[in-house]
Design a protein with these regions (language model features):
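A short Gly-Trp-Pro
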Residues: 5-162
Length: 162
């Protein structure tokens, strides 16, 4: 099942899980948070896109071969609790990577109060987000010890250019 919609300056075509009742809406927000529970957030609109990032920042930040992320419009993302627990790592290039200071959980990238979009770590969500990854980016930087899945997803050597 596919849906198309516009957010601020860009049109999106999103693949959602057929028959999914888990898409976030204002009446049924999708919540998530860190491992220790200090930081909680909610999303009130469907994801704009989702994908795997194989960049070296994501590898080092997560300790894994890639990071599964879903992009949401800033206006649909709300921090519910734990702002004082959030810490940010600002790489030389790119957007801030936010995590919980207590448990270290990687939660999202971007500045939720000012950026057009927020990239949420799909593993930080409480339930199925109703979207599946559609692409793999930074495949030129993929970890040599984890072969890329032959899953038919679009591949980008560098950034997808959100």
């Amino acid at each position: 099942l596919a849906a198309s919609y516009r957010s601020s300056r860009r049109d999106y075509r999103v693949v959602i899980v057929s028959g999914s009742d888990s898409l976030p809406t204002p009446d049924a927000p999708l919540q998530g948070g860190c491992l220790c529970g200090a930081v909680r957030f909610e999303i009130t609109a469907p994801f704009l896109s989702a994908g795997y990032c194989h960049c070296t920042h994501c590898q080092r930040r997560t300790g894994t071969g890639s990071s599964a992320n879903g992009r949401v419009a800033q206006e649909s993302f709300q921090l519910l609790q734990g702002q004082e627990q959030l810490r940010a790592f600002q790489p030389e290039t790119g957007v801030p990577k936010l995590f919980c200071a207590t448990c270290g959980s990687a939660l999202f990238s971007g500045q939720p109060l000012s950026d057009e979009q927020v990239a949420v770590r799909l593993g930080a969500l409480d339930r199925d987000p109703g979207i599946r990854p559609q692409y793999r980016q930074f495949v030129d930087s993929a970890a040599p010890w984890e072969p890329l899945a032959q899953d038919g997803l679009e591949r980008y050597p560098r950034s997808r250019g959100h």
